[in-house]
Amino acid sequence: GQSISDNGKWVACKMEPWEGDAVVNLYDAQGKELATFPRADRFLFSASSDYLVVSQKPGKMIVDSLKIKKTKKDKLPMDALVIYSLLGDREVIDSLKTFKLAEKVDWVAFQKGRKDSTLYVQPLNANLSTRYEAPAVKAFNFAEKSGMLYYITAGDKAEEKPGLYLLNTETGVKTLIKEGDGVFKQVTFDEDGANLAFLYCAQKNSCYKAMSLWLSQQGAPATEVVARGNQALPKGWVISEHGKLQFSKSASRLFFGTSPEPRQKDTLQLAENRPNVQVWSWDEPVQYTVQDYNKE
């Protein structure tokens, strides 16, 4: 694969051999090679075109040798994240679990370590001291056209309450949009990050029937806009936890999915008391009794 920076001055190409590790090479507009990144996986130019962000996998030969030695999965080496400045400087973040790069600002959010669920948010410019951290984060993402970031956290006992937060990376303002340790799904920004919609259910085992739609506007705490039993929903219908939330282009409309309330398995009925129906065709070449015997 290949990628061209937005200003057209830089090109990154990924070379993948039939067997072994991939390499990302960085070139200028004249075709001069500027840098090489071995064991490369994902690679992205920043919004300003001043940085190239590359995630690196552990070497395949190293991982294979460790697997042969029956090394436990949690003892295998982890990925790394390289933040390369087109001026030549680079920062390496080890033990990478996952990362998201903002599309319109030079910021990155990531988690590292297998047992550490802390979210780290920082500018790509290593000379800037601004850093943010959030504990026990389950999910996070940037808005498409701004530096707004949401994250869902289980919280901690000290400062952070459980719930959905909104972080403005440009101002440093953090807002608790919805407090709760229930289930958040389909968290969705509009393009500019001014509005944030999501589904929420307080009880995990009731998500199939009790999801409600929430909306935060201009960074304000979210309010519930549609819930089970709303007059707009047909009788017996619920907000679907699988439906995709989507704002219109102007963000004046919000689309969400509905469905008849799903039927759930009766867990109070013993298996031997449930009807056992067998279905087969009259013209099958092998009789059902023989099929049943062969299956056993």
Q: What does each model-found stretch correspond to?
A:
Residues G1-E296:
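Beta-propeller folds
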